[in-house]
Amino acid sequence: MPVWLMAQANADHIRWQDRRTLTWADYQGKADPDAGAAASTATYLSVEYNFKDGKLGYVITCSFSRSKSWGLTKNDYILSHEQGHFDIAEIFARRLYKKLKAYEFDKKNYQTDLRRIYEDITAEKEEMQNRYDRETNHSINKEKQAGWLEKIKIELKELEAFAGY
């Protein structure tokens, strides 16, 4: 029986794809004018796993929620910042895949081990998302924003071998 960690992807969700970037049409959530942000991007990282015939099977999903994402200020610059959030989620999907490929699971402990790995990865993802917003001042600091987008691009490239999760 498969077990899900996090939310299962559905019609509301767009899976991360290298050749598809977000557009403002993807942002269908109700904007929150009191949020103090120009936009909000809701990303999800999930893993479905099972242990069958002595082998661990898993499916990792990195997705964007249309209904939970919104934009007040809709321009290409803000959209680029928001795409950065989605790309950071993809970095951690690849890191999760890398850890799962390298880890030696056993039938007795695999559920506990997988939960720990998943929780560690998601905590690191949230920390990086927060640091991205903090250091770029939510994209206001254009120099830092450009640096972060380059850093994200480099890390995605470095983890390219783990994109086939």
Which positions does each model-derived feature cover?
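Active-site recognition of the HExxH zinc-binding catalytic motif
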Residues: 77-89
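Bacterial Sec-dependent N-terminal signal peptides
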Residues: 1-11
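Metalloprotease/metallohydrolase-associated module, dominated by Zn2+-dependent proteases
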Residues: 10-54, 60, 64, 105-165
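A mature extracytoplasmic/lumenal domain signature
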Residues: 64-66, 90-92
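C-terminal soluble interaction/assembly domains
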Residues: 71-72
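Sec-exported extracytoplasmic/periplasmic mature domains
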Residues: 88, 94-101, 105, 126, ...
